[in-house]
């Protein structure tokens, strides 16, 4: 399944840590691309450094027009906006997964950093809430992606990884391959 994440808004110094966590969570739980509406060199470099060390293909892009991108994406895929004000994920996730299974469409997930423009709600095929209490967009994204992928992305392994962790009951099992 091809999954992309669109982070609407990014408030420079204030958001660089959380935006980095959004990108790393996206990568770790199955997304292939993170899209931002503005450049942040620190976030880009952090993401690229992780991908280089831990492997896999994960793209970082900055959009000129998020609305144009979403409109074009809708021609081929499904757009899901994660918001506290959407439909209950527990009531809608089965429908989302059925639609994706039937059509093998790519998925674009929209999450906000600041007040999300009304157009995001209107352009989305689904506006989903992950809980009705205040929490982080990283938490919402992680829960949604885990449900979407059925947990299969949590232990991904990449042939080009320089660093790999093997789950263990009692010890740290880390492999580091230099020069790879």
From Swiss-Prot:
It comes from the Archaea. Coiled coil: none annotated. Pfam families: Trm56 (PF01994). This is tRNA (cytidine(56)-2'-O)-methyltransferase. SUPFAM superfamilies: alpha/beta knot. Signal peptide: none annotated. Belongs to the aTrm56 family. Disulfide bonds: none annotated. Its EC number is 2.1.1.206.
């Amino acid at each position: 399944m091809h999954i992309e994440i669109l982070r609407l808004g990014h408030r420079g110094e204030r958001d660089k840590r959380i935006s980095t966590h959004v990108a790393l969570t996206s990568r770790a739980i199955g997304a292939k691309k993170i899209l931002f509406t503005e450049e942040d060199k620190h976030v880009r470099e952090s993401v690229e450094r992780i991908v280089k060390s831990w492997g896999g293909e994960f793209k970082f892009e900055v959009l000129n027009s998020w609305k144009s991108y979403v409109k074009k994406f809708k021609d081929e895929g499904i757009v899901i906006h994660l918001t506290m004000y959407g439909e209950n994920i527990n009531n809608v996730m089965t429908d989302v997964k059925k639609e994706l299974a039937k059509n093998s469409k790519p998925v674009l997930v929209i999450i906000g950093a600041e007040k999300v423009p009304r157009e995001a709600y209107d352009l989305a095929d689904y506006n989903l809430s992950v809980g009705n209490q205040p929490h982080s967009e990283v938490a919402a994204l992680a829960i949604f992606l885990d449900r979407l992928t059925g947990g299969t992305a949590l232990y991904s392994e990449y042939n080009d990884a320089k660093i790999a962790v093997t789950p263990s009951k009692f010890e740290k099992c880390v492999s580091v391959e230099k020069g790879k």
